[in-house]
């Protein structure tokens, strides 16, 4: 009840025990952010940054469909002081993935990210693509955008952070599935070495820094900060 007393319908939560736990909750995971705070994993790092992304799947007319076509834009309808951009991916079966991302550090308190996305679709280039088409799916999600400068320490006693729990999204590409999967593979290798040879979990971060993920995020490190200069 409201006072914390167990009611007749109370059922205790499931207790999961493991020697090593991998946290892969995605952007701003509830447990991940608690662990980062508890173990001070972000000490000496830039504050993490976030955005909100909208995505729609459209079925368009055959004459406008160009399978494999990719469009990325920055700016309009946002002003020069607000970070954001769009993507249009022409998939198969006359479908496109259309989306817009806006950084949640925007200064205008009256800005509505959803409304800006709707306004974006009135741009002549985009309107021409979706005219006569049909929206068949839509959604929204938070994105982690701090990038290289905000990567926390990724290991702690008995646990590892992977994917967006660790902030591995490549912000300019608006892409994080590939880095999440690779970080999971590195975590698996680290766990096997720990269980077989009792190696320290700190080797996870060493392996991460030697991988292509680290190089990719380093190459993109100045894109997001450049919008604040």
Feature names for model-found ranges:
Residues 1-128, 186, 190:
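Predominantly flavin-linked oxidoreductase catalytic cores and closely associated redox partners
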Residues 29-31, 105-107, 147-150, 168-170, ...:
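Flexible loop/turn segments at secondary-structure boundaries
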Residues 45, 108, 150-153, 171-179, ...:
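Alpha-helix capping and helix-loop boundary segments enriched in small/acidic/polar residues
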Residues 56-61, 138-142, 206-215:
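Short, conserved secondary-structure transition motifs
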Residues 72-84, 139-152:
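Conserved alpha/beta core surface patches that mediate binding of polyanionic ligands
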Residues 128-139, 196-203:
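Flexible, glycine/charged-enriched surface loops at secondary-structure junctions
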Residues 140-171, 202:
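FAD-binding beta-loop-beta segment adjacent to the flavin cofactor pocket
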Residues 167-173, 185, 189-229:
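Active-site-proximal substrate-binding core of FAD-dependent oxidoreductases
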């Amino acid at each position: 009840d409201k006072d914390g007393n167990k009611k007749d319908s109370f059922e205790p939560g499931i207790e999961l025990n493991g020697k090593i736990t991998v946290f892969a909750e995605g952007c701003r995971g509830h447990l991940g952010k608690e662990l980062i705070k508890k173990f001070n994993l972000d000490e000496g790092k830039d504050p993490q940054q976030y955005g909100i992304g909208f995505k729609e799947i459209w079925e368009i007319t055959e004459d406008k469909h160009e399978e494999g076509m990719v469009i990325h834009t920055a700016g309009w309808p946002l002003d020069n002081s607000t970070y954001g951009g769009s993507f249009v991916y022409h998939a198969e079966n006359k479908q496109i993935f259309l989306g817009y991302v806006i950084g949640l550090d925007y200064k205008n308190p009256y800005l509505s990210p959803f409304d800006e996305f709707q306004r974006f679709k009135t741009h002549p280039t985009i309107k021409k693509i979706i005219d006569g088409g049909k929206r068949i799916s839509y959604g929204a999600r938070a994105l982690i955008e701090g990038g290289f400068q905000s990567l926390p320490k990724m290991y702690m006693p008995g646990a590892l952070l992977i994917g967006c729990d660790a902030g591995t999204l490549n912000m300019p590409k608006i892409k994080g599935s590939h880095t999440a999967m690779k970080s999971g593979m590195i975590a698996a290798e680290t766990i096997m070495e720990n269980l077989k040879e009792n190696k320290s979990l700190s080797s996870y971060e060493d392996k991460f820094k030697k991988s292509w993920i680290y190089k990719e995020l380093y190459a993109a490190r100045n894109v997001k900060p450049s919008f604040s200069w």
